[in-house]
From Swiss-Prot:
PANTHER family: MEDIATOR OF RNA POLYMERASE II TRANSCRIPTION SUBUNIT 20, UBIQUITIN SPECIFIC PROTEASE HOMOLOG 49. One of its GO terms (molecular function) is transcription coactivator activity. GO terms for biological process: regulation of transcription by RNA polymerase II. The gene is mdt-20. It comes from the Eukaryota. This is Mediator of RNA polymerase II transcription subunit 20. It is found in: Nucleus.
């Protein structure tokens, strides 16, 4: 996995896919991301909601994030899929919020072997909430090496969205390693906005 930039698109998924096919993107398959809130069984200010996430690119992993004000201070973990089974046994403390679950399903494209673009429709239950695009630059895992190039790619391909860089791009000044948790944080932030849409 390289460095990813995730954003909500204003167009339909088909419109975004046509743009990608117009620049020579090849359809590689499907992808799925889910964002599942687990709330404290008793409402309390002492305990935060735990967000459990999965990405089809990492089929053996479960991502767990307790969102705070920003990514750096939020408790987070990468676990194996067995973590989901453990959560089921913690029903006395954490209760799954099925109504708040966001699923993103769509297609994965490859462009000139260096870029992977995932275009998915976000749903909450049976309600369509929006279109989410993930642009991944595969050759590097160092943000400072590629963020300007990624902004230029997004500007050239979509003619917008390039000015709203992900939080991790803005706070990273040193050559730090990008991880899948950084991608999942971006999905979490978008899912939080999508839940508020009517």
């Amino acid at each position: 996995m390289g460095v990813s930039w995730v954003f909500e698109a204003e167009q339909t998924a088909k419109s975004v896919e046509r743009i990608l096919e117009g620049i020579g993107a090849e359809l590689m398959g499907q992808f799925q991301v889910d964002v599942i809130p687990y709330n404290p069984a008793t409402p309390s200010t002492d305990y935060a909601t735990n967000i459990v996430m999965h990405h089809s690119k990492c089929p053996q992993s479960t991502f767990s994030i307790c969102p705070k004000t920003d990514f750096r201070v939020s408790p987070k973990a990468v676990c194996d899929r067995g973590f989901d089974l453990i959560l089921g046994k913690l029903a006395g403390g954490l209760v799954i919020d099925n109504a708040g679950k966001i699923e993103i399903n769509g297609n994965e494209y490859n462009i000139h072997s260096d870029w992977t673009v995932r275009v998915g429709t976000a749903t909450q239950g049976t309600t369509v909430k929006g279109v989410v695009v993930e642009v991944e630059y595969d050759p590097t895992v160092i943000i400072v090496q590629c963020r300007e190039m990624m902004a230029e790619f997004i500007k050239q391909v979509f003619n917008k969205y390039h000015e709203t860089q992900p939080e991790i791009f803005k706070i990273t000044e040193k050559p730090e390693r990008y991880s899948t948790l950084d991608t999942m944080w971006q999905y979490l932030q978008i899912a939080a906005k999508l839940r508020k849409k009517t």
